[in-house]
Amino acid sequence: MTNTAENAQATAEGADKATKPCVAVLFGGRSSEHSVSLITARSVLRAINRDRWDVVSVGISTDGAWFLYSQEELEALLDSQPMATLPAGDQRVTLPLQAGESELLVHNLTAEGGSLTRGRHIDAVFPLLHGPFGEDGTLQGLLELADLRYVGCGVSASAIGMDKHFMKVAFESAGLEVGPYTVVHNRDWLHSPEKVRERVAELGFPVFVKPARAGSSFGITRVDRAEDLDSAIETARQHDLKLVIEAGIVGREIECAVLGGHEWAAPRASLPGEIEVQGHDFYDFEAKYVEDDGARLSCPANLPEEVIETLREKAVVAFDAVDGEGLSRCDFFVTPDHQVIINEINTMPGFTPISMYPRMWAASGLEYTDLIDELISLALERPVGLR
């Protein structure tokens, strides 16, 4: 264990020195990526170092209720239904929102009434929620209001990283090259649809129509013909009324993982990996999570050394551009002439052992359990409150 990691573990406020720091692992949530979050949480709960951390697992239902869920309950649920949603649990909990109080509040409900009792003291929260109401700054703001340390990016970085429009604005301001795109607001489509069609035609086909604030490729459609544009827009609008429409780019899809530095040191970038999509027009939800042969993931990517270094440098620039903390995955296109174009940043990437973020760190010498340790240690180094 490094000195910085030891210091991080020792500085958890309120923790009894004779006990291990307690980490609350959060999963589920209200977004369309609820089931993906459960898969991520199962992987983390299997691998987390329980010799170093006490663990409390908290599931959030699709209507936003918080319950204690054991690892065994989660395992049984996913064994019976791989893309499951959480049922209501037996023990409901909430966060205290008074400064200085960090114990979960346990609901004791009976037919005659109920009461709240204090549960476990929480030293850090590991939020494993993907998409809106989890990865977009809303949950991060709640944790800051509750004076709880947490893994990952803060409110502003999470919000920017969830919005495909504003992340591009941040990238451009940092000097990174982004592909051609246009933003379609709700009023644009409702009142001036023909102007939207004209803007898209200027990009040239194919284009990718995307909800601005959704993940796991939900609502994304590749459009090769103008006559298919309207239906793609309506599909995306089911997930978000703000859309980003991007010109198609001919290039290899390359990703790079970023990990924060200890004691405010510079972020670290992994070796990059490559996604080779098979049988799909792009890396969609089915290729990511449903079909075993939907994509081939290669790490490290077979690229010239100078391109690898450029990718790592640009990943750190992108991380800093959104004011990232903890972790992020940066997605790029590398064109046939080795031009590097950033596509997006993901502030809570897929985190199963076969997901690209952990795989890229494993290829860089940091194994899955150690990566989890690093992220929790980084969270414990940060102050409570606004970040």
Question: What spans do the regions from the language model cover?
Answer:
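Glycine-rich phosphate-binding loop of ATP-grasp-fold ATP-dependent ligases
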Residues: 37, 179-183, 206-231, 253-255
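Short beta-strand-to-turn element immediately C-terminal to the catalytic PLP-Schiff-base lysine
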Residues: 184, 220-225, 258-261, 335, ...
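Hydrophobic beta-strand scaffold residues
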Residues: 55, 149-150, 178, 207, ...
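Phosphate-binding site of ATP-dependent enzymes
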Residues: 224-313, 339-341
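ATP-grasp fold ATP-binding core
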Residues: 171-172, 199-217, 241-254
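ATP-dependent carboxylate activation and anion-phosphoryl transfer catalytic cores
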Residues: 2-21, 27-30, 50, 302-387
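ATP-binding N-terminal substructure of ATP-dependent carboxylate-amine bond-forming enzymes
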Residues: 1-156, 160-166, 173, 184-194, ...
